[in-house]
Amino acid sequence: MKVQFKAIAFAAATLVLGHAAWAGEAEAKKWIDSEFQPSTLSKDQQMAEMKWFIEAAKKLQAKGVKEISVVSETITTHEYEAKTLAKAFTEITGITVKHDLIQEGDVVEKLQTSMQSGKSIYDGWISDSDLIGTHYRYGKILNLTDYMGGAGKEWTNPGIDIKDYIGTKFTTGPDGKMYQLPDQQFANLYWFRADLFERKDIKDKFKAKYGYDL
């Protein structure tokens, strides 16, 4: 049993060292040339951004950070993040990303438990923006506005422009601070019968009732 334990420990150490050894600009270039196209950024701009991630990861590893754990509900967008982007981040930075995919109800339950206990079982949570009220009232969720501009500035991608994100109003609390960074959203589509809007009898009834044209 003692020998087996040592073997497992050695294998784990090899895995961690292996990720660090593979990580770097060559891996970043591979992902830029393949998965990260097309892009609004040029490949040189993408590489400059990847270099920032690589250097930031080295600082985090020096502080003992080897893995980042994230959880989200199981939908196609998050499956891509868990299976593809997590792999890209790991290969480029050497820091492993463990992205759990579970049911939406389980995400809410685990989040609620973590907030009540004051101990988070994940480093990052992807939750619906309609929980913004809960996040604000509990006072347990990191205020991203202050963090990214203060204590977390060193770990915040300098290329981020919050104006590029759609829906930040829905992730901002009553205090004007942002508690969630929009990740994806469901588009609302409204369908209507165009022919009904063209019927004279309906137009006449509408104007008679409301005083203006349909």
Positions of the model-derived regions?
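Gram-negative bacterial Sec-dependent N-terminal signal peptides
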Residues: 2-22
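Hinge/lid segment of periplasmic solute-binding proteins
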Residues: 25-62, 129-189
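Short, polar/charged alpha-helical segment
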Residues: 51-59, 76-94, 195
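Extracytoplasmic "Venus flytrap"/periplasmic binding protein-like
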Residues: 63, 87-164, 200, 205
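Ligand/substrate-recognition segments at binding pockets and active sites
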Residues: 67-84, 104
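Short, well-ordered beta-strand segments
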Residues: 69-71, 125, 182
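Solvent-exposed loop/turn segments at secondary-structure junctions
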Residues: 75-78, 104-107, 129-133, 186-189, ...
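Helix-loop-helix "hinge/cap" segment bordering the ligand-binding cleft or interdomain interface
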Residues: 91, 98-100, 145-151, 172-214
